[in-house]
């Protein structure tokens, strides 16, 4: 490495444009007739792509997904006609986030609700949106602990900053009045400001089994379903169907 190369790497590091330090690779791949402006453009493209990749990585890590699932891996053939592949493609465009709409997925266990929620969250991350994935029961515990430890406001601000909040499994545990009030506030604060995805195996008529305050249940459903897409995903179990196919 000559002195010029060393200086280029040094300045690239100081200016935080590491892709420019790899200019020799761009030169090797470039058209021999390319001019200086063409080479500069290729370097800028490489730097932009690198930054986008790093940002995507950070967003994925911050989202807190328990595992990664994609839209391409989701088998929508077992869903009812109300949830068409075309509609899923529309959701995957993340226009619902741009429109500040919610998505409510209702279906029996094993219907692929969590898979679909994660896949939509992954799409959102790659499109530049900040996403948070939270199990509903875990979040209610975190909210209570945050309040007891006098940093509830900090957690609420973190949740509010998410362009998309995914509340998974809002059905397996019931919530006491204290937990209900904290969850309600989180959802209420997001209404018409940002998007929320909720997965649950209970129809709205059974949500009174989850929360002590029936009046709050009506208000919660009202907040969630306003400007929302409600997906009825009931039918044969997605996991059961996959298991039977593996045995065949």
Q: Where do the protein language model's features map onto the residues?
A:
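N-terminal pre-Walker A segment at the start of P-loop NTPase domains
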Residues: 71-94
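The conserved Walker
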Residues: 109
């Amino acid at each position: 490495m000559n002195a010029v190369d060393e200086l280029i790497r040094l300045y690239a590091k100081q200016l935080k444009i590491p892709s420019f330090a790899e200019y020799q690779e761009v030169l090797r791949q470039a058209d021999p007739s390319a001019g200086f402006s063409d080479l500069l453009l290729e370097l800028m493209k490489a730097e932009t792509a690198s930054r986008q990749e790093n940002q995507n990585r950070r967003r994925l890590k911050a989202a807190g997904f328990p595992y990664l699932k994609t839209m391409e891996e989701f088998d929508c053939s077992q869903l009812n006609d109300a949830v068409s592949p075309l509609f899923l493609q529309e959701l995957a465009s993340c226009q619902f986030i741009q429109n500040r709409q919610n998505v409510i997925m209702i279906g029996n266990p094993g219907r692929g609700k969590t898979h679909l929620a994660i896949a939509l969250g992954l799409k959102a991350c790659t499109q530049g949106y900040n996403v948070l994935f939270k199990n509903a029961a875990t979040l209610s515990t975190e909210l209570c602990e945050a309040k007891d430890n006098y940093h509830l406001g900090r957690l609420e601000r973190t949740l509010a900053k998410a362009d998309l909040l995914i509340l998974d499994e809002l059905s397996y545990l019931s919530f006491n009045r204290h937990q209900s009030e904290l969850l309600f506030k989180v959802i209420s604060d997001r209404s018409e400001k940002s998007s929320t995805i909720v997965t649950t195996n209970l129809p709205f008529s059974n949500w009174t089994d989850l929360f002590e305050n029936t009046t709050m249940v009506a208000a919660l459903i009202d907040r969630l379903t306003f400007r929302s897409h409600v997906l009825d995903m009931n039918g044969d179990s997605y996991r059961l169907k996959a298991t039977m196919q593996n045995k065949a």
